[in-house]
């Protein structure tokens, strides 16, 4: 007897298109998990050179959610930005917000309410990308 294989549903979102690699921007060498991350680093270096921010760092600090034993127990922001005002904020670059990513941001609000986390989503990325012809090192990671 032949038992037909059960059809499995194709995932609604695939990460096959994401390009990652080691890049050097502004003298800082790091592993960019996506071309978006590399491009946003180039954008922050542009802002630094223009005097709009003091500095930026890639994946500088892990925030731990004390007491959480299952699921998301920590959060590693993509960037730390030191602003001219003295404020330090963290930036997350996300083209697609999955459940795990949403949980991380919700837990950040709960466990670290004083920490500023800015999200660069598709819309914000597109706004920045419109200025990419001014930004040195934009497009370092390509297929």
Where are these regions (language model features)?
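Electrostatic, structured charged patches in enzyme active sites and in nucleic-acid/phosphate-binding
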Residues: 1-143
